[in-house]
UniProtKB/Swiss-Prot annotation:
Protein name as catalogued: Leucine-rich repeat, immunoglobulin-like domain and transmembrane domain-containing protein 3
Keywords annotated in UniProt: Cell projection, Disulfide bond, Endoplasmic reticulum, Glycoprotein, Immunoglobulin domain, Leucine-rich repeat, Membrane, Repeat, Sensory transduction, Signal, Transmembrane, Transmembrane helix, Vision
Protein's UniProt keywords contain Transmembrane: yes
Effect noted on mutating residue 134 to P: Defects in depolarization of photoreceptors in the inner retina, and defects in cone photoreceptor light response. Gross morphology is normal
Residues in Ig-like domain copies: 254-344
Organ and tissue specificity: Detected in the outer plexiform layer (OPL) of the retina, where it localizes to rod and cone ON-bipolar cells (at protein level). Also detected in bipolar cell bodies in the inner retinal layer (INL) (at protein level).
GO-annotated cellular components: cell tip; dendrite; endoplasmic reticulum membrane; perikaryon; synapse
Taxonomic source organism: Mus musculus (Mouse)
Length: 681
């Protein structure tokens, strides 16, 4: 009897849960021909102030709209395991618990538009792994926290329009960065896109939303704005201006530079990897492995100036587990950029110490043993820019790279660049299975503690490794170049012109021509040029771009090994005959011009001086030849008509006229008789 009562109670409860519809809601069941179906529940009673607790468990779509529900309690829908659509639009919801959507693992669409939310529990998205649409339109949300970015990855539609947002986290759009690199699964289907609604918010246009501003200016992107015609509210100079017309002056996405893309190193050696970045604001640099894990090696990072930052990672005593990709990621408010370098580890390591090493004093460096095939000379020490330091750097483009090396051959007649002193080798490591050796040498530093290593790629100089910094010097001292066993002899000049020269040599190795490196420089200069790999041939190389009539020094050495005296040659380029004839023609033209112009100038000067000296007598002579009107003087006393009109002598009239016009003539006449006035009476 008791068992039957309990059974009836359980059945009645299950029946109420499965089939009972809340009194303030309406429930509809839509069946299909295959016997399956879906249940729709609609609750829009204006008097409803809380979420009912007895929805049918097979509900697939629940709509609670236009009610006065103000709060979503914890686990409000936990038993609706088949729920796919939850619409809570145009209510009065002001708060949501973190666990309000617990157990809604099949939910595809969540709409909370038209409520009074000031915040959303973003962590609750973990309880809804299949959620694709989240509508928070027309609420009072004022900010999106930085931690929300990690939960947005699975969303395909996010509507935050008509809220109170002024800015967004810098990494907001990075939530969907995987879509930019993931190719489409099939050519018949378009790539997956994200719909993002951000319009009708009082945006403050600065670097924090620079990515959104740039997004509004492009059309083909994985993330599509629901309304690209968004406007700025602040600052005042951007107020009312469309995102598409805003130009932010101090926002620059980082650019990352690495001096090599592939590094091959011996097992147990040390490698330095360097990364340089520029951007505004000044970017932050992080190193990660290909699997996303952080790097557990010493990392040095420094910002020498605003907008510039570099970072160095030291891989000491590397093993095969250290091989792989190393990513340098630069990040600031304007965006993220990264560069990748691949490290390859080869060989096995055995350390060989000379028999008399124990007899030396602790402070005395060990003696270096000559290597076979190298003529017993001391291997040069070379200062390289990291990464590399164990092999010749590999560049993405085949363009020639300019770098400065410090060599240490024995004294010879070579130019001063080949006479620098270097540190001796302290350890020799043999690589099993290969006839190669690794010489661990510290880079040579100039007085003052600064290294002269530098590289120029594609015409752009990379800065030195800031060797003045103690930490960086400590890392540089651990670097080691790798020397391959290639014997080169009989280096000679096969052909030379005014602008190029062809070098030939004999090699006892069966390796390809790419196993050697050709360096050259103008005689007496310190900057060495690396010959382009495209100019290499079988045991020969062509150096182009030389100056006619100049002296150069060229060296051929195995890749990763510095130049030696016996592998270098001095040559001079031919003089261009055409240039001499041009100079001769120019000299003839100049001489002819001087012969013609100089006498003409002298003649003109003579004429000018002559005119200046003869100007006064010339004018006096002209005045004397002029004809003047003769004047008669009337006497004030009574005279006869004959006497009154009696003409005076011509010379006296002329003298009277000149006396009234010229002071000089007046003085002369006064001395000789004066200007007498004659009266006839």
């Amino acid at each position: 009897m008791w068992l039957s009562a309990c059974l009836c109670l359980v059945l009645s409860f299950l029946g109420g849960v499965n089939g009972t519809c809340p009194s303030q809601c309406s429930c509809e069941y839509h069946g299909r021909h295959d016997g399956s179906g879906s249940r729709l529940v609609l609750c829009n009673d204006l008097d409803m102030n809380e979420v009912p607790a007895n929805f049918p468990v097979d509900t697939s779509k629940l709509r609670i709209e236009k009610t006065v529900v103000r709060r979503l309690p914890a686990e409000a829908f936990y038993y609706l395991v088949e729920l796919q659509y939850l619409w809570l639009a145009y209510n009065s919801v002001a708060s949501i618990e973190t666990s309000s959507f617990y157990n809604l693992r099949q939910l595809h669409e969540l709409r909370l538009d038209g409520n009074s939310l000031t915040a959303f529990p973003w962590v609750s998205l973990l309880d809804m792994p299949h959620l694709r649409t989240l509508d928070l339109h027309n609420n009072r949300i004022a900010s999106v926290p930085n931690e929300a970015v990690r939960y947005l990855r699975n969303l395909t539609c996010l509507d935050l329009s008509s809220n109170r947002l002024t800015t967004l986290p810098p990494d907001f759009l990075d939530s969907w960065s995987h879509l930019a690199v993931t190719p489409s699964r099939s050519p018949d289907f378009p790539p997956r896109r994200i719909i993002l609604g951000l319009q009708d918010n009082p945006w403050f246009c600065d670097c924090h939303i620079s990515k959104v501003i740039e997004l509004s200016k492009v059309t083909d992107h994985a993330v599509v704005l629901l309304d690209p015609l968004m406007v700025c509210s602040e600052p005042e100079r951007f107020q009312g201006i469309l995102f598409q017309r805003v130009e932010l002056e101090k926002c620059l996405k980082p650019s990352v530079m690495m001096s090599a893309t592939k590094i091959t190193s011996a097992l147990g050696s040390n490698v330095l990897l360097r990364c340089d970045a520029k951007g505004h604001p000044t970017p932050q640099l992080t190193w990660t492995r290909s699997d996303g894990s952080t790097v557990n090696y010493t990392v040095i990072q420094e910002s020498p100036g605003e907008g510039i930052r570099w970072s160095i990672i030291s891989l000491t005593s590397i093993s095969h587990k250290d091989a792989g990709d190393y990513r340098c990621k630069a990040k600031n408010l304007a965006g993220i950029s990264e560069a990748v370098v691949t490290v390859t580890v080869v060989g096995g390591v055995t350390t060989t110490l000379s028999p008399d090493s124990s007899e030396r004093s602790p402070g005395e460096p060990p003696e270096q043993h000559p290597q076979p095939g190298l003529g017993g000379s001391t291997p040069p020490s070379k200062s390289w820019l990291s990464p590399g330091l164990t092999s010749a750097p590999s560049y993405p483009t085949p363009s020639a790279a300019l770098y400065t090396s410090t060599w240490s051959p024995p004294p010879s007649s070579l130019p001063p660049i080949f006479s620098a002193a270097s540190a001796t080798t302290s350890v020799q490591t043999s690589i099993s299975g290969r006839t190669a050796r690794t010489s661990h040498q510290p880079p040579l530093l100039h007085p003052g503690g600064k290294s002269n290593a530098k590289i120029e790629k594609n015409g752009r100089k990379f800065p030195p490794l800031s060797a003045s910094k103690k930490e960086e010097l400590a890392l540089l001292d651990q670097a080691a170049p790798m020397e391959t066993n290639v014997t080169i002899k009989d280096l000679r000049v096969a052909r030379e012109t005014g602008v190029s020269v062809t070098l030939m040599w004999n090699s006892s190795s069966s390796t390809q021509e790419s196993s050697v490196t050709v360096l050259y420089s103008k005689y007496g200069e310190k900057d060495l040029l690396l010959v382009n790999a495209d100019d290499y041939g079988k045991n020969q190389a062509t150096i182009n771009g030389l100056e006619p009539g100049s002296q150069y020094v060229a060296c051929v050495c195995p890749k990763g090994v510095g130049p030696r005296e016996d592998l270098c040659i001095t040559f001079s380029t031919n003089r261009v005959e055409g240039r001499g004839s041009q100079w001769s023609l120019l000299l003839v033209v100049t001489s002819t011009a001087c012969v013609i112009v100089v006498p003409l100038i002298c003649f003109l000067l003579y004429k000018v001086c002559k005119l200046q000296c003869t100007s006064d007598p010339f004018w006096e002579e002209d005045l004397s030849k002029e004809t003047y009107i003769q004047f008669e003087t009337l006497s004030p006393r009574s005279q006869s008509i004959g006497e009154l009109w009696t003409r005076r002598h011509r010379d006296d009239g002329e003298r009277l006229l000149l006396c009234s016009q010229s002071s000089v003539d007046s003085q002369m006449n006064l001395k000789s008789d004066g200007c007498r006035t004659e009266y006839y009476g």
